[in-house]
Amino acid sequence: IMNINNLNNLIELFVNQANKQNKKDIFLEWLNPSNKKTYTWEQTEKNILKLSKVIKENINEGDRCLLVSENRPEWFVSDLAIMVAGGITVPAYTTYMEDDYKYLIEDCEPSLVIVSNNEMLKKLNNSINEKDFIKKVITLDEINKVTNNLNLINKEKYLDFNLIIENNLLEEDKIENNKLNRKSPACIIYTSGTGGNPKGVILSHGGNFE
């Protein structure tokens, strides 16, 4: 039985479970009856590691990373990969309008944006084009579909999640971030207030255990 009191952060929690479950499925993606896809713990761990390496190359420790996606396996992979890379996840509702995203981006100044599809990027595109502090944009769906019919100022900013997870891992690669403890920020949640703009609330790794 795992004692979460012995864990320092959410990455350790995942790795602990991944080592036990390994070949078992963690996700079932059901797009339609003839299109089902499963992901094992082992496969998910590798995908987190591959993505985290690319993120780490493009952010500094403590940088915010905006995550705009529906609930899907890649959301989970992205969230953990950001933490492993030393970033702080800023998840955003997919129901936000363009002005909401603009406010969020100006408030938290993310170095990286992860976006799922064309519909979402349409609402983010103007802000991404305007803000130099956004170094990279990673698309969860195939990159050409996500960027279709959009005016991108800098196409070099854009990376494809699906190509990233095709990368090979080195023998010594493993998931860890020894700098994270229970007081370290895990994410910034923007909550809708009764009036005015949403307020960002920092949630720590320890706070997620409670």
List each model region and its residues.
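Conserved pre-ATP/AMP-binding loop-to-beta segment of ANL
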Residues: K24-I26, Y158-L159, E166-Y190, N197
